[in-house]
Amino acid sequence: MEGDKFHMINQIKKFNNILIIKIYSVIIIIVFFIVFYFLNKNGRNFKTSKNIKSIEIYLDKYEENYFNNIKDNITKCSRMWSNQCQFLNGAVRKFKPKKILELGVAEGGSSIIILNAMQDIKNSHLFSIDLSTHHKIGSCVKNIFPHFLNKWSLYTGNVAAKFMEEIGGDIDMVFIDSGHYEPGEILDFLIILPFLKEEALVGFHDIGNQITKARERNEWAPYIIFNIIRGKKYLPSGDNILTQDIGFVKLEKNQFLYVHDYFRALGGQWQYFPNESDINIIKEFFKKYYDKECITMFEETVKFNREFVKKNPLKTKYIYDSSSESYFNKKKKK
């Protein structure tokens, strides 16, 4: 009898303990929802985001004395404004990259800025790629700054995917100033991404084209990719934030988490269509470095835009014609 009574008392205690735990749990949940409701009643407050240093604006002033070494000659070669040249110089001087990649060379204006800024960086080297085989590609480096040639390798006549495995990985910094029309820089970024160090610095020129006269020519690619890449952004000082025309992104770690987003960015309406041999090179290249879902997105995007570009030809296709002299001829007439 005593044993039964003792057992009953223990059961009552256990029941009470369980009941107390459940009551506390319900109270905690109710309090949580009350707090959540009042915090979000009038919309979420993002004002605290100003304390998060996601954007740095000072690279154009960083060790600008290095840029002064070439300032007098660079105007003959570069299509960038002086503050943009200083910004590119500042990026190299601050981060001291050893392995740098450049996509889009023309006469070599940005190549000269990079090469000049990296001269005292031990074991540094610049690898530059341009689709064109025009004789003026890189001509300013060769003719005006030949003493920079020992730190420079130039690849021409094909898409970046053709050269990346030869150039190799562990790239610290990239500067892209290539097509501007979609897919342009979006496609370029996807090609180079597997070869970058985890927190590499990736720069783009003409990221302000969305509100300049270039808007009329749909030169949106650098603007799109610069803004969707996950990482800390660096922009020039002094400019209106909407018109800043050059910028760098210091990549977040684990970029593989975001590659599907980057491939989706290719899904817009392309303003030009690469030739079929280039498409095949890029497709086979992607198969080595990206998953099946990415490849499917690429194939579907190519299929759609092949037809779109046929029906909506863009007049300014000269940028992508590697056998044409029209870009340089057009520049000369200005």
Where are each of the predicted segments found?
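Intrinsic-disorder-associated, low-complexity terminal segments enriched in Asp/Asn/His/Tyr and depleted
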Residues: 4-7
